[in-house]
Amino acid sequence: MPLRADLQQSCRIKYIKIPEVARMLHIPDDTPVWTDDFRILTREQLNIPALHMIGHAHFQAAGAKLDTHFHCNMEFVVVLKGKQQYIVDGKLYTLYGNDIFMTYPYENHGSGGGSQDVCEFIWFQFDMSSSQNFLGLVPPYSEYLFRQLLNYRHRTKKANMKDLPVLQRAFQLLGSEEISQQIQGYSYFLQFVTNNICTTDIELTREVYSTDIQEAIYYIHTHLMEDLNIEIIAGHCGLSASRFKAKFKEELGITPHAYITSLKVDTAKIFLKDPGNTITDVAYQLNFSSSNHFSSVFRKYTGCTPTYFRNHRFSNIY
């Protein structure tokens, strides 16, 4: 698919002065970006009323921390793979594949003191200033979607796993130079929004995990200091190893091995707060084969070494 020629600029950020409020970082997301791991389509490129932007990020190694900031629009983040963390009003939200995360206009959020994790996600923003011609629709459809978003109260919820490829396809087609493909992308985007965000459901949260996968998660958390074997975890849940791995990834959007490793890294951050724990102590407490192996994994998931993390007190959010 040919890529649009105007997608080569870098994103900019700016400060907005707000009376009687501490100076806050505003990220307008109004400049096109098109790199291997970070892409943004702006409202001028999209030509869809009220859709301020849509972006795609694919971090294959830990990235820089996301500073606390706000947008003037309602923002949704849909995690496709891996793990992502955000802090809003001092509360930490940990997201995995298939999770949807929402922030309101002008609401401060960021990744806290830590780096962004290995993950892939799509995010988009709605301009909620008017229901007229919302998302290019006419009444009653425009008013229905606008009203559903105004009444949206889920900080996090689960997306339908089958709709994730729909959202990915929407982004790909919206970035095309062909108008016919842009129209298809618009259709796919509306399909995802109506099926997963502008719904009439009362509660769609992490409780959708099946009983056996909930058992696996509990087992992993309670045996984290041990040598966690996939076959043993699968047997504990009454599943074959192959079925367990497939079902775990289907429901969490991340492999059991990646989930365990990520959890061990988060636990290591807590252990590193204790000056009595050496790097080697932490490595062996969490069953890494060596301190070098631990340091290598820690760096991949956080973007820094355990020593650097400890010295700079990045663990203050845990």
What are these regions (language model features)?
Residues Q132-P140:
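Short, charged, solvent-exposed linker or helix-capping segments at domain edges/interfaces
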Residues L80, I197, H221-M225, K269-K273:
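Short, locally clustered residues in the helix-turn-helix/winged-helix DNA-binding domain
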Residues T200, H221, E226-V265, N277, ...:
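Basic/polar phosphate-binding segments, predominantly the helix-turn-helix DNA-binding elements
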Residues I122-F124, S129-N133, L150-Y218:
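An amphipathic alpha-helical interaction segment
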Residues M1-I100, E107, S115, P140-Y144, ...:
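Generic protein-terminus/edge-of-domain signal
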Residues Y106-S131:
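Ligand-binding loop in jelly-roll beta-barrel domains
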Residues T211-Y219, I260, K264-I270:
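Pre-recognition alpha-helix immediately N-terminal to the DNA-recognition helix
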